């Protein structure tokens, strides 16, 4: 099935998508992840989003025009840049192709796109930037449902995240928090705000405070360090690559992260979880040695993924070796003969399942034990366990339990440990089903997890990714059916996993899925219909 889906995703890229509808236009112009900023660099990187009412539209070339005044640009003259290429598909972080820029210089620019029919589209609306370093915080998401409790949790989370970002942008360098607090909020920052600039600045501040051995501090400017906080130095470059699509910044940080991990291995070569830095602990008493070995497993897993943007295919062998040794040490020390964990806390179960320390055949017993504990005791974790709870339930297919726990238990102190700790990430990626399967959301996986509970009847969400706006909206119908609408940005392909029984009838915009343009059925199971969608907006109806 995976190979079939991969072939289906690649097929339009290889043969070229059929163009449907109107010409393509550039919109959402930005510079180094900022809209009309006072830019931080004399070598700015320019981005735009493709807009078209047609389906399957793609960029084949681009024409960048930049001028020192709005009047010159309006006359279609580029005294700073006039770059025209008929074979340039880059639309995200396009390098500056004009004259050298100076600090304080004001630049007005626009772009037009050459599509697959070799037709130039209209000029974009003009944008501008000034060569000086600022930070601006703008929203990039929306979420609502019929359930007030979920909506209120979303609103509280957004207010908390926005307050931290705005205080940091205003000069309060402690506002984002420790490394642990930042990494727990990283995906939420990216999903809900144009947060690349402040998070990159925070990462640079962490790097400026590295110890001589290469350890990241607990927070910028501090001297202490530990396994929980230091993992921020690895997670932030990964997020820059995967969520913001910035492989150049991720590549730049490879030697820094590598020095840090090699220092950890040198201190604890047998990966026993030996205490390093300041002692760490959790609210439920999970031992620090257990935490150390699991968090090293997580760091190693992310490092293997970072090897792709860093272009380090040979060095990844080191981290495969680390992973095998970490796994063996964990299993020797913490797995009982019957396959259960010797540490019987919910945090211990969550870390074991998320941190690459178990073999696949060892996971189900740990999952069953965790689910049993959650059903009997409710949520019994602190901030570290909360970071992993909803992702683990999502990845193990326990979506109804995740919704039940959020709906029943997130109040008071329990709610507080989830605010800014992955809650809106779960709403957007699980409930709304918006996920990327390529860096920078160049390909999507739309997979809404619709709870069986009758309390939640519909969800509507959008995310303004670096590749354009992604929309997802599902609604349960009274007859047991489902309506699902979505928008896939121009230049992007999506894999859709639509909840539908095998005998259900599925239509898109009133047509069969075989007749609908831009829709390709890959396969159907007893519970799901899998499609590949070209760019465009779609309205599916599922009738039982």
Predicted regions and their residues:
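Non-catalytic C-terminal accessory modules of carbohydrate-active enzymes
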Residues: 321, 325, 404-544
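Substrate-binding groove/exosite segments of carbohydrate-active enzymes
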Residues: 137-266, 272-278, 385, 389
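Pro/Thr/Ser/Gly-rich low-complexity, intrinsically disordered linker/stalk tracts
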Residues: 22-54, 132
């Amino acid at each position: 099935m995976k190979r079939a889906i991969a072939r289906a995703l690649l097929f339009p890229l290889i043969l070229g998508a059929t163009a449907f509808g109107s010409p393509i236009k550039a919109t959402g112009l930005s510079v180094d992840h900022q809209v009309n900023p006072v830019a931080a660099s004399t070598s700015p990187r320019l981005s735009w989003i493709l807009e078209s009412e047609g389906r399957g539209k793609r960029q084949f070339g681009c024409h960048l025009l930049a001028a020192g005044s709005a009047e010159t640009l309006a006359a279609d003259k580029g005294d700073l840049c006039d770059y025209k290429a008929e074979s340039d598909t880059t639309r995200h972080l396009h390098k500056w192709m004009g004259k050298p820029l100076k600090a304080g210089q004001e630049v007005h620019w626009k772009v037009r796109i050459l599509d697959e029919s070799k037709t130039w589209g209209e000029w974009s609306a003009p944008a501008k930037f000034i060569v000086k370093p600022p930070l601006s915080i703008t929203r990039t998401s929306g979420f609502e449902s019929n359930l007030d409790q979920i909506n209120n949790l979303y609103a509280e989370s957004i207010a908390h995240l926005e307050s931290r970002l705005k205080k940091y942008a205003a000069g309060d360098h402690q506002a984002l928090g420790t490394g642990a607090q930042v990494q727990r909020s990283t995906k939420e920052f990216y999903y809900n705000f144009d947060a690349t600039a402040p998070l990159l600045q925070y990462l640079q501040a962490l790097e400026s405070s590295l110890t001589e051995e290469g350890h990241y501090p607990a927070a910028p400017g501090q001297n202490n360090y530990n396994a929980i906080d230091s993992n921020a130095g690895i997670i932030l470059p990964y997020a820059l690559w995967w969520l913001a699509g910035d492989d150049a910044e991720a590549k730049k940080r490879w030697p820094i992260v590598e020095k840090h991990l090699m220092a950890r291995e040198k201190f604890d070569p047998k990966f026993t979880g030996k205490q390093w830095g300041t002692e760490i602990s959790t609210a439920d008493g999970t031992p620090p040695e257990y935490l150390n070995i699991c968090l090293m497993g997580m760091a190693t897993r992310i490092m293997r993924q970072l090897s792709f943007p860093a272009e380090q295919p040979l060095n990844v062998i080191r981290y495969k070796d680390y992973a095998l040794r970490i796994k063996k040490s964990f299993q020797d020390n913490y797995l009982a003969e019957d396959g259960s964990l010797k540490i019987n806390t919910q945090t211990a179960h969550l870390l074991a399942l998320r941190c690459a320390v178990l073999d696949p055949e060892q996971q189900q017993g740990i999952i069953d034990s965790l689910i049993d504990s959650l059903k009997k005791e409710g949520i019994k974790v602190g901030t570290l366990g909360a970071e992993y709870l909803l992702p683990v339930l999502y990845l193990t297919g326990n979506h109804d339990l995740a919704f039940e726990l959020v709906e029943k238990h997130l109040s008071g102190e329990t709610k507080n440990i989830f605010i800014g700790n992955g809650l809106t990430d779960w709403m957007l990626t699980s409930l709304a089903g918006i996920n990327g399967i390529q860096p920078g959301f160049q390909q999507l996986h739309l997979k809404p997890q619709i709870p069986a509970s009758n309390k939640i009847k519909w969800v509507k969400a959008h995310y303004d990714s670096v590749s354009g706006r992604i929309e997802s909206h599902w609604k349960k119908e009274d007859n047991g059916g489902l309506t699902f609408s979505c928008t896939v940005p121009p230049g992007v392909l999506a894999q859709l996993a639509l909840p539908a029984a095998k005998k259900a009838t599925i239509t898109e915009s009133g047509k069969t899925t075989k007749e609908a343009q831009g829709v390709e059925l890959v396969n159907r199971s007893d519970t799901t219909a899998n499609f590949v969608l070209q760019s465009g907006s779609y309205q599916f109806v599922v009738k039982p």
